[in-house]
Each structure stands twice: as structure tokens, then as C-alpha cells.
Amino acid sequence: LPSGSFTVEELLAIMNTMPFDMTFVDRDDKVKYFSQGKERIFQRNRAILNRDVRHCHPPASAHIVDKIIEDFKSGKEDQAPFWINTGGKMIHIAYFALRNEKGEYLGTLEVSHDISGYRKLEGDQRILSYKK
């Protein structure tokens, strides 16, 4: 890696400690990975691995999935943000086109994050205060 190194065990711990969910879809539109954090927003089952991403979304949103993938592959767009209110939470969902150094499309990263707590922040917290 150009900026350091870590073991697979360390990488797994990093991916599962991040305070958001991640799902990776490869250039062939197959789901290849999802993080397994303690508080996943959208539950994932290993059965989705290697499945076409279009079969992982409700039929009503299939055209949106197709549009995002088409725009990412063509280079027209590099990210697609959404936010929804569900179950009393504000969820931010962002899709990012992953590209190599030549700009070639490698796949899509979906990042989902419960931002409810951030929306309530006021002022500063400059002194250490652990959440109990």
C-alpha cells in the first residue's frame, strides 16, 4: 500500500469498527463484500455475496440502481448521495464510484450511516467525555 500497511486481521477490525455500513459491488455488478459492524443499518446475509446488485434492492428502485451504475461506469458521475428517515432515524446513504489510477471503473462502494446524533450536536466538545 502506498501509505502504510496492516494485516488482514487489522483490516477486518478496521472495517467492522467504522461507524457506518459498507458494501462493495465489483465492476461486474456483483456484491463482493459487506462490513459486519455491531450496529448495521441494513442487515446483510452472506447469501447476497456474488449476487447481482439489482437483485438486492426492491423492484421499485431497480431503475435507480441501473442509473447509478450506468453513470458511474460511463464516468458521468462519481457519487450519488441519498438520505431517508426510517424507524425514527435519519440515514445517509452514499454510493461512490471506485476507480484505479487510470480512471477505470472498478466498482461501487455503498456507505450507509445513521446521522441522527450528528443532527443534534450543538456547540463544541473539546474536553474528553466518554459516552456511557
Regions found by a protein language model. Give the residues of each.
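Sensory modules in modular signal-transduction proteins
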Residues: 1-29, 34
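Juxtadomain coupling helices with adjacent low-complexity linkers
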Residues: 4, 8-11, 114-132
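Generic surface-pattern signal
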Residues: 16, 20, 58, 70, ...
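Sensory/regulatory domains in signal-transduction proteins
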Residues: 31, 37-121
